[in-house]
Amino acid sequence: WEIFFGGRVNEGVVDGATFIINPTNGSSYTWTILQTQQIASSRLRALEQGRWVVQVSPTGFSAFVGPDGAVYDRTGITNRTISEHQISLRTGRTPYSRLGNNAYFWALLVGLAIVIRQRSRAFQRAAS
């Protein structure tokens, strides 16, 4: 379940992980809602970290997720299969890896500052 928590995945990357593995078991959950969320979380972690994610599940979706968030070779629920996909090992850190969730906070602050500045200028022009 660690794939749902960006900080936990980031710890592995900081420690030198060159790809991310997501072993999971969704047997307690009916239908595909949770398994679909896990694939979405794997895509998000791949984008955040610039790494391949290999999701392996005996009861849910198994898949390879590229650093660009593209999903490859996704299996169906409970499909028994052996999947192979060529992945590249990656090093280095993305801005998200360096800033963590603070990246979203800083982006929000910068966006707010731009909006406030533009409104302030418009107000000053209207007052002149």
Give the location of each predicted region.
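Solvent-exposed soluble domains appended to multi-pass membrane proteins
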Residues: 1-128
